[in-house]
């Protein structure tokens, strides 16, 4: 009971923001003109007529590199705050971070062995 009172302002803020978001999207949908034509279905390339097809299929290796990048980017996001507050947590936090890094290294080795990082 007392715990919920502490968050009353947050819930009111959340309701107000939700209401205004729905209101703004509804108004823009209602007020905006609907233009249907062939120009809507073409891609925009800096004012120049598009050359070739707009939808091309990328090779899977681009996605694999992007996936590995995202994994290690997320690792950096988690490790930076841990490194900044390392002295406050103690040895248990250090062991947990080592386990986290070990799991990511195992994933990197797995991707490397499967050839996901090869460009040929």
Swiss-Prot record:
Q: How does it sit in the membrane?
A: Multi-pass membrane protein
Q: What is catalysed by this protein?
A: a plastoquinone + NADH + (n+1) H(+)(in) = a plastoquinol + NAD(+) + n H(+)(out); a plastoquinone + NADPH + (n+1) H(+)(in) = a plastoquinol + NADP(+) + n H(+)(out)
What coarse category fits the chief subcellular location reported for this protein?
plastid
Give me the segments passing through the membrane. 7-27, 64-84, 89-109
- Example GO molecular function term? quinone binding
- Output the Gene Ontology cellular-component terms: chloroplast thylakoid membrane
Which of UniProt's keywords are assigned here? Chloroplast, Membrane, NAD, NADP, Plastid, Plastoquinone, Quinone, Thylakoid, Translocase, Transmembrane, Transmembrane helix, Transport
Q: Where does it live in the cell? A: Plastid, Chloroplast thylakoid membrane
- EC category name: translocase
Instruction: Return the EC number.
Output: 7.1.1.-
What GO biological process terms does the UniProt entry carry, in alphabetical order?
Answer: photosynthesis, light reaction
Q: What family does this belong to? A: Belongs to the complex I subunit 3 family.
Q: How does it assemble?
A: NDH is composed of at least 16 different subunits, 5 of which are encoded in the nucleus.
> What role is this protein assigned?
NDH shuttles electrons from NAD(P)H:plastoquinone, via FMN and iron-sulfur (Fe-S) centers, to quinones in the photosynthetic chain and possibly in a chloroplast respiratory chain. The immediate electron acceptor for the enzyme in this species is believed to be plastoquinone. Couples the redox reaction to proton translocation, and thus conserves the redox energy in a proton gradient.
Recorded protein name is NAD(P)H-quinone oxidoreductase subunit 3, chloroplastic
């Amino acid at each position: 009971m007392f715990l919920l009172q502490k968050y009353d302002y947050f819930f009111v803020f959340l309701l107000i923001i939700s209401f205004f978001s729905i209101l703004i999207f509804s108004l823009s949908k209602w007020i905006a003109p609907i233009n249907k034509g062939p120009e809507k279905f073409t891609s925009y390339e800096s004012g120049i007529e598009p050359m070739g097809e707009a939808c091309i299929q990328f090779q899977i290796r681009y996605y694999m590199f992007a996936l590995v990048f995202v994994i290690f980017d997320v690792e950096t996001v988690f490790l930076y705050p841990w490194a900044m507050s390392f002295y406050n947590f103690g040895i248990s936090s250090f062991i947990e971070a080592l386990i986290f890094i070990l799991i990511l290294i195992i994933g990197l080795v797995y991707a490397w062995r499967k050839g996901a990082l090869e460009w040929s």
